[in-house]
Amino acid sequence: MSFDVYVIRVFGKSRGSREAGMSVSAGLEVAAGSVASALAAQEGGAMRVELCHGLGGGGLTPSYGMLAVVRERLHIPLYVLIRPRGGDFVFSEEEMEVMCCDVECCVRLGCDGVVLGALDPAGEVDMGMMRVLIAVAGSLGVTFHRAIDVSADPGRTLEDVIALGCERVLTSGGRSSALEGAETIAALVAQAAGRVVVMPGAGVSAGNVLELRVRTGAHEFHASARSVVAARRLGPHPDIHDLGGDYDCTDVDKVRQLVRLLSQGAS
């Protein structure tokens, strides 16, 4: 199905109401790459899960099977990353079709929101593509992801995100970690002035989350809170590193620690 057909299909749809105000107390969103990680996030007290696949490469859209099982078992809000491939955030018409189909799956399964982002070749928000994706999402909440960090002008991107009606934007302040980008994040929080939630992410941990809160003024934080899980050694082939190796999973104790710190540091 072509991009134009999608425009015709969804142009008349209503997004529904979305809340964009800052919460008074601080909360934690956990990026989860598996069913086990999502359940650990919930057990640890996270306020929301962002479900994705391939966290090591910035995250991709999870499989339908993973999404269906997590939706059935999770009782806290579930947002789903919609990203069909790694690399940049300039998407083709075919990739747009894939993203629309993935968003429709989220709607059918009763997810609470989606995490989106699309840029044009000039590094500006692709407003046309974003409007179509948001229309397909209907009443689901929308987070604009870290495409803002590679956009031409983060301040202008923030205004576009607000104009689109997104609930929040995830950002590292254009740096490798949120701590390195804290000054830029603080500027975005001030610019947003409560019109959208600015959520720091990338390298957020128990060792820096309170510093980030003080330096940025943010009230929502995004972390994976992962630990390495040792793989079972099932055969005499230890040198095949791409098969059967160790893997990461959300650590419930790390989630609890982050949640506890944010609760203690609440203003």
UniProtKB/Swiss-Prot annotation:
It is found in: Cytoplasm. It comes from the Bacteria. Its main location: cytoplasm. It holds the Pfam family CutC. The keyword Cytoplasm applies. Keywords: Cytoplasm. HAMAP family: CutC. Belongs to the CutC family. This is PF03932 family protein CutC.
